A protein has these predicted regions:
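Catalytic core of nucleotide-sugar-dependent glycosyltransferases
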Residues: 184-190, 197-227, 231-270
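Conserved donor NDP-sugar-binding/catalytic core segment of glycosyltransferases
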Residues: 95-123
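Short aromatic/hydrophobic "clamp" motif used to bind/position activated sugar donors
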Residues: 83
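Glycine-rich, basic loop-to-helix element that forms the pyrophosphate-binding segment
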Residues: 62-78
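Short, well-formed alpha-helical segments that are part of the catalytic scaffolds
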Residues: 10-24
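Conserved nucleotide-sugar donor-binding catalytic segment
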Residues: 125-206
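A conserved acidic beta->alpha catalytic loop
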Residues: 21, 36-45, 87
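Membrane-interface aromatic/basic loop that binds lipid-linked glycans or pyrophosphate carriers
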Residues: 249-334
Length: 334
């Protein structure tokens, strides 16, 4: 059996499409755990309507406590051999669960990654050498890992980044990881999403980045991971905090805070990372590692790599000089 977890909060407009895509799966042995996180619209009524028609649907009705608390409740109530999540405003193809299940069985995987989730190529997020972090709905997890390790839960009072922390920690316990590139997850980006709002609020993001580092610092220390897994922590810093540093419209003070936080944690990380492993980092991130101050970092970026970041028509824009011409990037995408 596979457990499917759907966290629901005020999504009456999208919920039916989500539920229809899950109950219509070609793989039928499902338990569908719907956590109603204190919705104030008709979401609960829709869940109850569907639960009457399909006995596989279980509703957990609770006061609003946030994404992490809701997903943790779902984990505690899951009875399947595997677990995956679908956001309540998204939907999946009919063969989604079947493909992931067959992949896990074929490869004896503890963890299967939906490699083309939301048009993101996640292939370089997890390798034999290191891992960084993944979005919640790109993960297909063997439940025994979560049942045997009660410490592996979503961190409370962290958003955005709660899924990054959770996935990073769970992957430490996964012996076999595989990718599935045929399973299609349809991500619906909409106004009012809690995570999107948190990401847009740069000042909030600064506080969250500090929490990310504190949580993982403690996790690495408790599990004696510094000597063996520091490269993974460095990749987490690069793909989560450094990406935000490069693309978000921080104030000058907040930008300096994020820089200093990254430098402080990297001092602890990089003493356990070999120079040979720098091949896994971007040139810009190596500049950060080798810079002592934010002024020095931007000097290196500007003159060594001809990279300038600024605001242009109220959008985050980068300009890079390459092959005698300038390229304009929005959020580092052409």
């Amino acid at each position: 059996m596979i457990s499917v977890m759907i966290l629901v909060y005020n999504v009456e407009k999208y919920l039916r499409d989500c539920l229809n895509s899950v109950i219509g799966q070609t793989y039928k042995d499902l338990e569908i755990i719907c956590i109603n996180d204190g919705s104030t619209d008709n979401s609960l009524s829709i869940l109850e309507e569907y639960a009457k028609k399909d006995s596989r649907i279980r509703i957990i009705n609770k006061k609003n406590a946030g994404v992490s608390a809701g997903r943790n409740d779902g984990i505690e109530n899951a009875n399947g051999e595997y677990l995956f999540c679908v956001d309540s405003d998204d939907y999946i193809d009919r063969d989604y669960a079947q493909l992931l299940y067959e992949n896990a069985k074929k490869n004896n995987s503890d963890f299967v990654i939906v490699s083309n989730f939301n048009s993101w190529n996640l292939d370089k997020r997890v390798t034999k050498k290191y891992h960084s972090a993944l979005p919640t709905c790109s993960m297909f997890i063997k439940m025994s890992i979560l049942k045997e390790n009660k410490n592996l839960r979503y961190p409370l009072n962290v958003q955005p980044g709660e899924d990054a922390i959770f996935s990073h920690e769970v992957l430490m316990y996964a012996k076999n990881v595989s990718y599935e590139d045929k399973a299609n997850y349809h991500y619906i980006k909409r106004e009012g999403q809690v995570t999107q709002n948190a990401i847009k609020n740069a000042s909030t993001l600064v506080k969250q980045i500090e929490k990310w580092f504190d949580i993982l610092d403690e996790f690495y220390t408790k599990n004696n991971l510094w000597q063996t897994k520091s490269l993974s922590f460095a990749k987490f810093v690069e793909q989560e905090a450094f990406l935000a540093f490069r693309t978000k419209n921080f104030t000058q003070d907040d930008e300096r805070k994020v820089f200093d936080m990254m430098k402080n944690i990297l001092k602890k990380i990089m003493i356990n990372v070999n120079k040979d492993d720098y091949q896994y980092f971007s040139k810009e991130f190596i500049c950060l590692i080798e810079s002592n101050t934010i002024k020095e970092y931007y000097s290196i970026i500007k003159y060594k790599y001809n990279y300038i970041r600024f605001r242009f028509f109220k959008q985050n824009v980068s300009i890079r000089y390459k092959e005698n011409r300038y390229k304009l990037y929005k959020n580092d995408n052409i």
